[in-house]
Amino acid sequence: MASMQKRLQKELLALQNDPPPGMTLNEKSVQNSITQWIVDMEGAPGTLYEGEKFQLLFKFSSRYPFDSPQVMFTGENIPVHPHVYSNGHICLSILTEDWSPALSVQSVCLSIISMLSSCKEKRRPPDNSFYVRTCNKNPKKTKWWYHDDTC
């Protein structure tokens, strides 16, 4: 078994056995391929997203964990957030330039939970319309400009 597959198996078990708060692996999503997962997410209590349900799509290349996973919101409900575009793309540095092989699916999930939980106002990024019209389907091919750490 390739090192990528071993690593994904290990992370899959960790996510099944000890998921971050409000996160659940969609078991059906991994039945056909270990390289594409859907994680169901519920907004944390006491936040602007409390009780809302979202889905995250994780896609892993053959270079994982040296290459970050492609992660985006998918489905009917995309959170309205200053770092989440209406097409589901997430502007989060650990998904691109700050990625490290020491990070994991769980650490990505925790970062997304933290990002949503710290939000003070539901709004889209200022360039949402332009970005959604002109972006690549793969958010990893975007050259992100990280202009703040808050929302």
Swiss-Prot record:
Family label: Belongs to the ubiquitin-conjugating enzyme family.
Assembly, per entry: Homodimer. Interacts with FANCL. Interacts with STUB1/CHIP.
Mutagenesis or variant effect for H83N: Impaired substrate ubiquitination of both Tau and ATXN3
Domain UBC core, chain residue ranges per copy: 3-151
Pfam families, alphabetized: UQ_con
GO MF terms held by the record: ATP binding; ubiquitin conjugating enzyme activity; ubiquitin protein ligase binding; ubiquitin-protein transferase activity
Localization in the cell: Nucleus
One Gene Ontology cellular component annotation held by this UniProt entry: cytoplasm
The EC number(s) this enzyme carries: 2.3.2.23, 2.3.2.25
Enzyme class: transferase
CDD domains registered for this protein in UniProt: UBCc_UBE2W
Phylogenetic placement of the source organism: Eukaryota, Metazoa, Chordata, Craniata, Vertebrata
Organism: Homo sapiens (Human)
PTM annotation, UniProt: Autoubiquitinated at Met-1.
Gene3D superfamilies listed in its UniProt record: Ubiquitin Conjugating Enzyme
Highest taxon above the source species: Eukaryota
Chief subcellular location: nucleus
Task of the protein: Accepts ubiquitin from the E1 complex and catalyzes its covalent attachment to other proteins. Specifically monoubiquitinates the N-terminus of various substrates, including ATXN3, MAPT/TAU, POLR2H/RPB8 and STUB1/CHIP, by recognizing backbone atoms of disordered N-termini. Involved in degradation of misfolded chaperone substrates by mediating monoubiquitination of STUB1/CHIP, leading to recruitment of ATXN3 to monoubiquitinated STUB1/CHIP, and restriction of the length of ubiquitin chain attached to STUB1/CHIP substrates by ATXN3.
Protein name: Ubiquitin-conjugating enzyme E2 W
Catalytic activity entry: S-ubiquitinyl-[E1 ubiquitin-activating enzyme]-L-cysteine + [E2 ubiquitin-conjugating enzyme]-L-cysteine = [E1 ubiquitin-activating enzyme]-L-cysteine + S-ubiquitinyl-[E2 ubiquitin-conjugating enzyme]-L-cysteine; S-ubiquitinyl-[E1 ubiquitin-activating enzyme]-L-cysteine + [acceptor protein]-N-terminal-amino acid = [E1 ubiquitin-activating enzyme]-L-cysteine + N-terminal-ubiquitinyl-[acceptor protein]
Crosslink feature (Peptide (Met-Gly) (interchain with G-Cter in ubiquitin)) location: M1
Enzyme active site: C91 (glycyl thioester intermediate)
Biological process, per Gene Ontology: antiviral innate immune response; cellular response to misfolded protein; DNA repair; negative regulation of TORC1 signaling; proteasome-mediated ubiquitin-dependent protein catabolic process; protein K11-linked ubiquitination; protein monoubiquitination; protein polyubiquitination
Membrane among keywords: no
